[in-house]
Amino acid sequence: MSRLIINKSNSRICNTIVKNYLIQTKYTLQQQQHQQQQQQQQYVRSYCSLQQPKPSKPNMIEIVTHFFDKVKNKSFIIENYLNNPIPEQQQQLNKNIKINNTDKDNDTLEQIQLLDPLNNLGKRKGNEIFKVVENDLSNMTHNIMKTITDGVSANSTYSPSPSKKTHPILSSISSYYFELKGKRIRPTIVLLLSKALSSTVHGSQLKLAEIVEMIHTASLVHDDVIDEASTRRDVISINHSYTNKLAILCGDYLLARASVVLSTIRNPDVTECMSTALAELVEGEFMQAKSNGVVSFDNYLQKTYLKTGSLITNSCRSAAILSGADSNIINISTEFGKNLGLAFQIVDDLLDYTGSAEECGKATSVDLTLGLATAPVLYATQEFPQLEKLIKRKFSEIGDVEEAKRLVALSKGIEKTRNLAIEYCNRAIQSLLKLPQSESRDLLITLSHIVVTRTK
């Protein structure tokens, strides 16, 4: 009997201990989950407001934007990059850049100032920039037209027979956008950076400018088909002038001709850089098409880098490689291209809300119509959470687009987006200041200002 009582007592004690242990374990797990949620929320807040998180935690903005130091690693993808710590040099660079709080509750939002380290250098006019590379841009356009119409790149040793030349209709369609006056920002960046690093533009660097412009133009042709755009650069788009089928073939042809020119440079590192840029451009377009109404700044910045930033990043890296620069200068050039590329696309997304069709040379307010959530509406969601429902259904119901535009206008989304673009521009300028002083370097600073202050 005594043994039975003791056993029952022990049993009750054991049950109590087990029960308390389970309760404590459940409480501990809940606490851990709560802490993880708080950490994730803190990352998102710091991510969207550009606040620096605690030193012990990685800064998500920096992680996303510090890209391509491992460009030669073919398996390198953004998802892996997000788990890497910020290199020491980049942390030091962060200290030199003033990051204002863009998530204030005040009625007014402090405007981040553009860095102008050389006394109003940013106020110089754009024509000063293009005048320096005017002859190179002219030669570039001539070579592109020759490549398109004759089916052979300039200075190539390959000579096709007359029957192998480009079909006249394909040649005409492919030349369509090159005959118009575009911004030509990307080749200008390549040419100015080439001059800044080696005082002159080598033949291989001029070819690089041609490649970048052909890849970019091909992406515009394909974009117009995907977006069903009716205008481009103030004229009817190729897909509307001809057909979607011919437009797709035209874009494919431009990419093929760009690949031929790339092969004549005969530099495996440059080939890998530009091939990666082309692959990531497609990946970014695919990511946008399959967004499924994701409410995520992380997703937005990844797509922005892939669609726009990667081509500028890799073209700057390639220009540095072709100049014979050391690894430090190559990495500085890569950082410059990456940050300027992100700034450029963020401004494009901003102009979709603030610009006019006449100024931009293309339709505006199309992102919402296409169901795309870019920086202005993502920032506005912080103040108007009801926007999340609209984003998730990709603004597909009647009145969604108008309601989203109304709430963005009422929010600080426009100002925060402008601050974000300026922040990336400032980082690009900080990279340029690490290069030796030259007229071309200074003009790149001016160009960086133009990128974020433009109205089209």
Curated annotation (Swiss-Prot):
Cofactor: how bound: Binds 2 Mg(2+) ions per subunit.
Binding positions for Mg(2+) 1 per the UniProt entry: 223, 227
Cellular component GO terms, alphabetical: mitochondrion; polyprenyl diphosphate synthase complex
Record pathway: Cofactor biosynthesis; ubiquinone biosynthesis
Primary residence: mitochondrion
Binding site for Mg(2+) 2: 223, 227
Catalysed conversion reaction: 7 isopentenyl diphosphate + (2E,6E)-farnesyl diphosphate = all-trans-decaprenyl diphosphate + 7 diphosphate
UniProt subcellular location: Mitochondrion
Identification of the protein by name: Decaprenyl-diphosphate synthase
